[in-house]
Regions:
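Short connector loops at helix/strand junctions that flank enzyme active sites
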Residues: 109-111, 120-122, 136-140, 146-148
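Conserved metal-binding segment of the jelly-roll/cupin
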Residues: 159-173
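A short beta-strand-loop-beta hairpin characteristic of the jelly-roll/cupin
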Residues: 126, 142-161
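Asparagine-centered strand-capping/turn motif at beta-strand->loop junctions
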Residues: 176-180
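Conserved short histidine dyad/triad with adjacent acidic residue
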Residues: 116-134
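Non-heme Fe(II)/2-oxoglutarate
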Residues: 1-106
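Short, surface-exposed beta-strand-loop junctions and turns on beta-sheet-rich folds
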Residues: 133, 157-159, 183
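A short hydrophobic beta-strand segment most commonly corresponding to one strand
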Residues: 139-144, 165-167, 181-196
Length: 196
């Protein structure tokens, strides 16, 4: 794997699988809101009608999630990865600072499914591909909030510091390792093609 520090991005029309779009973004106010609302972590598990992908046979991951916009389905047997339904969670209103940063970077783009993911020290999220038709028309991004981590996608790998905004090709195998000395928190979000 090669270490990359790439810039600029279009709607996936290139050979790179990871692109660093910006570094040094001030995420202090985001961290303050996360500390103010600790009860928001994993709150989506208690929402009426909510079902985990683990319940549907997908591998469990060593992460906690604080989802602001989740995918929805019309029928219980439908696969959320093939659904275009996006639903704001109750925690959405608590986390305005992250949305301000995204709006500053992407102007009038629609933010679709999004949330914070935490990963304990030395833990790994193994290689996986985000499955379903939903992902075919969207770009996926990370904005690193806390901790230092190694991120890999395809044959590329980068070391990510807090305040780093990156795009990656989630149609390729990708994953991460927390190489820092604190829990890694990143904000993962989707923007439709043509808006990023």
């Amino acid at each position: 794997m090669s270490i990359s520090t790439m810039t600029s991005m279009t709607d996936g029309g290139c050979d790179q699988s990871i692109k660093i779009l910006k570094t040094g973004i001030n995420v202090k106010k985001v961290v303050e809101q996360l500390k103010k609302y600790p009860q928001d972590w994993d709150h989506q598990k208690t929402l009426e009608g909510s079902q985990s992908l683990v319940d549907r046979g997908f591998d469990d991951l060593p992460v906690s999630a604080l989802q602001l916009i989740i995918g929805g389905v019309k029928h219980k047997e439908d696969f959320v990865g093939d659904s275009e339904i996006n639903i704001k969670t109750p925690a959405y209103a608590h986390h305005s600072e992250i949305r301000k940063i995204i709006r500053k970077q992407f102007k009038n783009a629609d933010i679709h499914r999004c949330g914070f993911l935490s990963l304990p020290v030395d833990e790994i999220v193994g290689a996986h591909i985000d499955e379903g038709t939903y992902y075919l028309s969207r770009n996926r991004y990370h904005l690193s909030i806390l901790g230092r981590y190694q991120y890999f996608c395809g044959k590329e790998t980068v070391i990510v510091e807090p305040g780093t905004l990156l795009w990656f090709n989630n149609k390729l195998p990708h994953g991460t390792v927390n190489i820092g000395d604190e829990t890694r928190i990143t904000f993962v979000f989707d923007i439709p093609h043509g808006q990023s």
